[in-house]
């Protein structure tokens, strides 16, 4: 069926303001788990950490912090509150993100230099084709809104721009996908989703749609990251792309009669 509606994630799918966030989150978790006195090596801990981070990517950040707290507890440690872990993580990634946003606001760099290559052309083409667009992110709503405005892409998302309202919100990408189907905006097979995490794949596959995995090797986003590719395929991705420069070829598959 011809696509009538598309979901886009933000970080690593559209914007690169927080490129490198996973390295920072892994480092934070390694430090917390080492402090428990565990005999596990970094090489043994890293896959455990990366697994829960990827599984929860696209969902509210607090869930990854709750998973960290549980892993500390399992090793006999006394974890910080998940909200404190989140505060520490946001402080670390915020230093990088704030500098990139400053470059945008002051005109030092064009918005495209902090976006996945080809993003704007895809958004323009999908709107031209009459596809309704939603941007849905696990990042806090206020931050998402500021960034999409800075990129000058808010206008493309006629379905709306959504971030996580609060840590205790029940809002989810899967829930929104089910809602648009229930409202008659599109049938499940008429929905496509672009994302670099498990949540985007799960949400669209749950309603029978098509999932496009952004296995971008950040920050250049010129080639496929094998680690992301493997996990996105396992999560249900129908297509894997490193960026949107292959859009014309992908479009032939998505819009084939």
Label for each model-derived stretch:
Residues 1-47:
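Active-site neighborhood of HAD-like aspartate-dependent phosphohydrolases
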Residues 171-204:
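Conserved Lys-Pro-Asp/Glu-containing loop-to-beta segment of HAD-superfamily phosphomonoesterases
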Residues 1-8, 45, 50, 54-57, ...:
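Non-catalytic pre-domain segments flanking phosphatase-related domains
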């Amino acid at each position: 069926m011809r696509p009538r509606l598309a979901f886009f994630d933000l970080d690593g799918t559209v914007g690169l303001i927080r490129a490198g966030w996973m390295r920072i989150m892994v480092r934070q978790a390694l430090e917390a788990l080492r402090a428990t006195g565990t005999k596990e090596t970094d090489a043994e801990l890293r896959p455990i950490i990366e697994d829960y981070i990827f599984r929860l990517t696209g969902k509210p950040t607090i869930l990854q912090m709750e998973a960290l707290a549980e892993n500390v507890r399992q090793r006999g440690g006394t974890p910080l509150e998940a909200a404190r872990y989140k505060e520490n993580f946001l402080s670390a990634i915020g230093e990088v993100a704030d500098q990139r946003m400053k470059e945008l606001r002051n005109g030092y760099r064009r918005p495209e230099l902090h976006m996945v290559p080809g993003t704007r052309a895809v958004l323009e083409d999908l709107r031209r084709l009459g596809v309704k667009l939603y941007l849905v992110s696990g990042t806090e709503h206020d931050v998402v809104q500021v960034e999409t405005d800075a990129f000058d892409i808010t206008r493309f998302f006629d379905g709306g721009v959504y971030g996580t309202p609060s840590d205790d919100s029940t809002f989810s990408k899967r829930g929104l996908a089910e809602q648009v189907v229930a409202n008659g905006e599109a049938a499940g097979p008429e929905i496509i989703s672009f994302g670099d995490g498990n949540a985007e794949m799960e949400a669209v596959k749950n309603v029978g749609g098509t999932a496009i995995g952004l296995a971008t090797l950040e920050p250049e986003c010129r080639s496929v990251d094998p680690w992301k590719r493997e996990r996105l395929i396992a999560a249900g991705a129908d297509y894997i792309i490193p960026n949107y420069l292959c859009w014309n070829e992908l479009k032939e598959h998505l819009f084939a009669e």
